Amino acid sequence: MTLQEIFAGCTAKPLLAEEPMAKHTSFRIGGPADLMAMPQSEQELQQLLQRACEAKVPVTLIGNGSNLLVRDKGIRGLVIKLGNMLNDVAVDGCTLTFGSGVSLAAASRKAAELGLSGMEFAVGIPGSIGGAVYMNAGAYDGEMAKVVTSVRVMELDGTISELPAVALDFGYRHTALQGSGKIVTAVTVRLTAGDKQAIADKMADFSNRRITKQPLELPSAGSMFKRPPGYFAGTLIDQTGLKGYTVGGAQVSEKHAGFVVNIGGATAADVLQLICDVQDKVFAAHGVHLEPEVLVLGEE
């Protein structure tokens, strides 16, 4: 039985066979997914997961693909893209609950519209709020750990539960969700009442800084490396003379050395080789090991 036949009875449509993952990542890189589904509700997600569990089909979950590198041979089994799902928002005073598919930037703007402070840092971060919790995304001294109070999660067998923030074990670009098999379907944050103009001004400042300093004009997966203790990854890479360093179609950004950009036709192999080269050269020059921040999926 083919994958399309296994999932034919599911209400999530369309089911995309041999779907190029390059179309679904901000890097514009990645081989094909055997089958991709984009559920629009918890019920559709539950149905897909239960069918996959019964048929023993491997499942890979992605959000909006903004912090992701997919290898050139693609991903086997079923890929479920959650970025279009669960875009609802519920407001209860200073507490907001977002469906996991809400973009982080949209969540930040919604909070600002309500005069609530705490999510200004998120205005320019790409991706969904569900993915942002998974990776504990952050910028400008803000991070998801500072505002999240609980998450709603679904297990790979379709069961649903609520987890308090303390159960997520937040760390730098880390949560207990990583590798757990739990799928975030909703995120609850608690913010503080603030001055709308002051919030808007702070968001405008953060947006302008990103436009000025980051290579937003080229495909990338955001910051490539985690910040090593006591250092900035981009500064170390720049000091090693690697701005503009190129492997195939992948390049250390000439605008910000903490970013690897796709200058045209880059493959995952190009990016992975560039990462290794940068790690080796920075370690040789500074004795500091750079750890990638970007999630790597798929077959080599």
Kindly give the residue locations of the regions a language model identified.
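Structural signature of FAD isoalloxazine-binding scaffolds in flavoprotein oxidoreductases
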Residues: 30-31, 37-42, 69-87, 134-165, ...
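Short, basic and Ser/Thr-rich N-terminal targeting/leader segments
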Residues: 55, 62-64, 147, 218-219, ...
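Anion-binding (especially nucleotide phosphate/pyrophosphate-binding) glycine-rich loop
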Residues: 2-129
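Short, well-ordered alpha-helical segments in soluble proteins
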Residues: 111, 129, 133-137, 152-155, ...
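Phosphate/pyrophosphate- and phosphate-bearing ligand-binding catalytic cores of soluble enzymes
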Residues: 16-17, 68, 154-281, 285-300
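Generic structural motif
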Residues: 15, 87-91, 148-151, 250-252
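A generic local secondary-structure boundary/capping motif
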Residues: 67-68, 108-111, 119-123, 136-143, ...
